[in-house]
């Protein structure tokens, strides 16, 4: 059996740029890509916490340490500078891989600097 699972997440990143007239993608600070195990040109899902938009694009590299999260091309209509977003990737795992499965969860501050990394999400209470 194959299962599609969360592979990685950048939690509550702040959009720094929104470039409509740019080749479509989302530029992400290279240090954030590495911390979250997101590869350049990998498909990403973006969930805009500020306006509820959800969309798919791909990741490209921004300068290391820049804090850049730039939503580009048509997706720029769905995110503005200052918006909070969750950026997620998913992968398919077989039963043997599931025994070792753990997502890469990266938490950032308002400047998109890493403040925490985890491999589990705490139990949520209503």
Swiss-Prot record:
Where on the chain is Pyruvic acid (Ser) found, per UniProt?
Answer: 25
Q: What is its EC number?
A: 4.1.1.11
List the InterPro entries hit by this protein, alphabetically. Answer: Asp_de-COase-like_dom_sf, Asp_decarbox
The UniProt entry's GO CC annotations, sorted and at most eight, read: cytosol
Needed cofactors: pyruvate
Q: Which GO terms describe its biological process?
A: alanine biosynthetic process; pantothenate biosynthetic process
CDD domains given in the database record: Asp_decarbox
Detail which positions bind substrate. 57, 73-75
Per its record, what are the GO molecular function terms?
Answer: aspartate 1-decarboxylase activity
Q: Which keywords describe this protein according to UniProt? A: Autocatalytic cleavage, Cytoplasm, Decarboxylase, Lyase, Pantothenate biosynthesis, Pyruvate, Schiff base, Zymogen
Compartments, record wording: Cytoplasm
**Which reactions fall under this protein's catalytic activity?**
L-aspartate + H(+) = beta-alanine + CO2
Active site as annotated? 25 (schiff-base intermediate with substrate), 58 (proton donor)
Entry PTM: Is synthesized initially as an inactive proenzyme, which is activated by self-cleavage at a specific serine bond to produce a beta-subunit with a hydroxyl group at its C-terminus and an alpha-subunit with a pyruvoyl group at its N-terminus.
Q: Write down how the cofactor binds this protein.
A: Binds 1 pyruvoyl group covalently per subunit.
Pathway(s) this gene product operates in, as recorded in its UniProt entry: Cofactor biosynthesis; (R)-pantothenate biosynthesis; beta-alanine from L-aspartate: step 1/1
**Carries keyword Lyase?**
yes
The entry describes its oligomerization and partners as: Heterooctamer of four alpha and four beta subunits.
What is the role of this chain?
Answer: Catalyzes the pyruvoyl-dependent decarboxylation of aspartate to produce beta-alanine.
Give the similarity note.
Answer: Belongs to the PanD family.
State the name under which the record lists this protein.
Answer: Aspartate 1-decarboxylase
Protein species of origin: Thiobacillus denitrificans (strain ATCC 25259 / T1)
